[in-house]
C-alpha cells in the first residue's frame, strides 16, 4: 500500500476521534477527496523539480501516535525564549503538552486549536476564518486540512497589543518512529491589534538529550499549515526557527491575508532538517499594506531547504519587501523561488525582492528564481539574485591581521547574513539566533552571547 493510499484509508478512523464541528468535518472530507485525486507532487511538478520530496514520503509513516511522552523541563528549557515571560503552546510529537504551555483567555484567546474546534462558542469564528485562504490544489495543504486538529489558536481582539510574545514550540521526542505530524495554526488579529509570535522546531535526539533511541527509527515528517488573518491596522511580527535534526523533514505552508493599513513581517531561519520546504503566501486585500519577508538559511552535510514565496498585490498603494540569504556548506542544496504578482488595479506598488547565496562547500549548490508578474503600469518593482563564494581578498586581509582562517571565514559568513538578523525586533530572540548561527558556523564569533 502506498503512503497516499494509507493516508486516505486512515481518514475514517481519524474522523471518529476528531471534534464534531460540522463545518470542519465538511472541510476535512472535501480535502481528503481532493488529495486522493491529485496525490503527492514529484519532480514533474514545476514547483517541486529541485526538491526530492519523494525520498521522505516513507510508506511506514503514520498519522496515529501511540502514546504521550513526558519530557523533563531540563531537557527542553533551552528551546524556550529565555529571560522574558511569554505565552506558550508546546506540542510534543504533535500533541499538546499542558505542562510546559502557558495559555490564556484573558484579553485574548491563546490556546490549543482542538479546544476551539470542539467548542460551539467559537463556531462563528471558525466559519469565518478557518480554511478560507489556502491553496486547494496544494497537496500538503490538502493533507493538513484533512487531518487538522492540534495546533495553536491565537485571536487578538480589536485594539489589543499583547503584553508579551507568543511561542509555538514543536518538539520531536524521538519516542516513536514513522510519525507524520499535521499541526495546524489559526491566527487572527482584529482591527488595530498587535502581536509577536515565534514558532520553532526542535528535536531532542539532535541535541543528544532524547530518552528514547532504538534501531530502525524513522524520523517524523512534520506537515505544518498556518492561516493568518490581519484586519485593518493590525500589526504582526512572526518568526520561524527551523533548527531540527538533520534527518527530520518539515513542510510548512503559511497563508497570510492582510486588510488595509496592516503590516506583517515574517522572518524564517532555516538551520536544520533533511528536507525543508517553506511556502509563504501573502495576499494584500486593501490599500496601504506592508508585507515583509526575510530569511537566513545555513545548511551543511546533505541538507536541503526550499523557499517558495508569493506576494499578491490586489490593491493600490502597497509595499512588499523580500530579502533571503543562503549559506550552503558540504553537499547541501537550496532553492529560492520568489514570485510577486501585481494586478492591473494595483497601481503605485513598491515591491522589492532579493536573494543572495554563499556557497561555502565545494559540492554545495542552489537554484534561485525571483519572478515578477506585473499587470499595472505605475509601479516600482525590482528583483535580483546572486550566487558566490567568500571574498578571497577580504579573507586574506583578515588573516594578515592575525585572525586564523577558520575564524576569518566565520566572521565573513556572519557578516553576510547579519543585515537580515539585525531586523529582528526582539533582543532575546536575536541573541538566541546569534548563538545558533555561531554553532552552525563552528567558530567563536567573539560576540557577547
Name the predicted role of every residue range:
Residues 99, 103, 109, 113-403, ...:
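Conserved beta-strand/loop scaffold segments within soluble protein domains that form the structured core
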Residues 1-142, 326-329:
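N-terminal amphipathic, basic helical "cap/leader" segment at the start of enzyme domains
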Residues 15-18, 420, 424:
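Short amphipathic alpha-helical interaction patches enriched in hydrophobic/aromatic residues
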Residues 48, 411-412:
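Residue-level "edge-of-site" marker
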Amino acid at each position: 500500500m502506498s503512503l497516499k493510499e494509507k493516508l486516505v484509508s486512515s481518514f475514517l478512523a481519524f474522523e471518529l476521534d476528531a471534534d464534531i464541528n460540522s463545518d470542519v468535518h465538511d472541510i476535512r472530507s472535501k480535502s481528503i477527496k481532493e488529495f486522493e485525486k491529485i496525490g503527492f507532487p514529484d519532480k514533474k511538478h514545476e514547483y517541486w523539480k529541485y526538491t526530492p520530496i519523494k525520498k521522505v514520503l516513507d510508506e511506514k509513516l503514520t498519522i496515529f501516535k501511540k502514546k504521550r511522552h513526558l519530557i523533563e523541563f531540563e531537557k527542553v528549557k533551552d528551546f524556550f525564549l529565555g529571560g522574558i515571560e511569554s505565552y506558550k503552546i508546546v506540542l510534543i510529537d504533535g500533541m499538546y503538552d499542558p505542562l510546559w504551555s502557558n495559555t490564556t483567555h484573558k484579553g485574548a484567546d491563546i490556546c490549543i486549536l482542538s479546544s476551539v474546534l470542539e467548542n460551539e462558542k467559537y463556531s462563528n469564528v471558525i466559519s469565518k476564518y478557518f480554511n478560507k485562504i489556502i491553496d486547494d490544489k496544494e497537496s500538503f495543504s490538502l493533507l493538513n486540512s484533512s487531518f487538522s486538529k492540534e495546533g495553536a489558536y491565537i485571536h487578538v481582539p480589536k485594539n489589543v497589543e499583547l503584553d508579551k510574545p507568543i511561542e509555538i514550540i514543536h518538539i520531536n521526542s524521538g519516542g516513536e518512529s514513522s510519525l507524520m505530524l499535521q499541526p495546524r495554526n489559526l491566527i487572527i488579529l482584529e482591527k488595530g491589534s498587535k502581536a509577536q509570535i515565534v514558532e520553532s522546531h526542535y528535536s531532542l535526539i539532535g541535541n543528544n538529550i532524547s530518552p528514547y533511541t532504538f534501531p530502525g527509527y524513522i524520523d517524523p515528517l512534520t506537515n505544518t499549515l498556518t492561516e493568518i488573518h490581519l484586519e485593518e491596522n493590525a500589526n504582526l511580527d512572526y518568526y520561524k526557527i527551523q533548527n531540527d535534526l538533520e534527518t527530520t523533514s518539515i513542510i510548512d505552508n503559511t497563508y497570510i491575508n492582510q486588510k488595509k493599513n496592516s503590516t506583517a513581517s515574517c522572518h524564517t531561519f532555516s538551520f536544520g532538517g533533511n528536507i525543508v520546504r517553506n511556502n509563504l503566501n501573502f495576499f494584500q486585500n486593501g490599500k496601504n499594506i506592508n508585507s515583509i519577508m526575510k530569511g537566513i538559511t545555513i545548511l551543511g552535510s546533505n541538507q536541503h531547504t526550499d523557499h517558495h514565496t508569493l506576494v499578491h498585490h490586489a490593491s493600490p498603494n502597497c509595499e512588499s519587501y523580500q530579502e533571503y540569504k543562503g549559506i550552503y556548506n558540504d553537499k547541501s542544496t537550496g532553492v529560492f523561488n520568489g514570485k510577486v504578482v501585481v494586478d492591473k488595479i494595483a497601481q503605485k506598488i513598491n515591491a522589492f525582492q532579493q536573494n543572495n547565496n554563499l556557497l561555502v562547500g565545494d559540492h554545495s549548490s542552489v537554484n534561485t528564481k525571483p519572478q515578477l508578474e506585473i499587470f499595472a503600469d505605475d509601479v516600482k518593482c525590482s528583483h535580483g539574485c546572486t550566487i558566490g563564494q567568500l571574498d578571497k581578498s577580504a579573507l586574506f586581509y583578515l588573516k594578515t591581521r592575525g585572525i586564523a582562517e577558520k575564524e576569518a571565514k566565520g566572521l565573513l559568513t556572519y557578516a553576510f547574513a547579519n543585515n537580515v538578523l539585525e531586523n529582528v525586533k526582539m533582543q532575546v530572540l536575536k541573541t538566541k539566533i546569534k548563538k545558533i548561527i555561531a554553532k552552525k558556523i563552528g567558530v567563536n564569533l567573539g560576540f557577547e552571547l
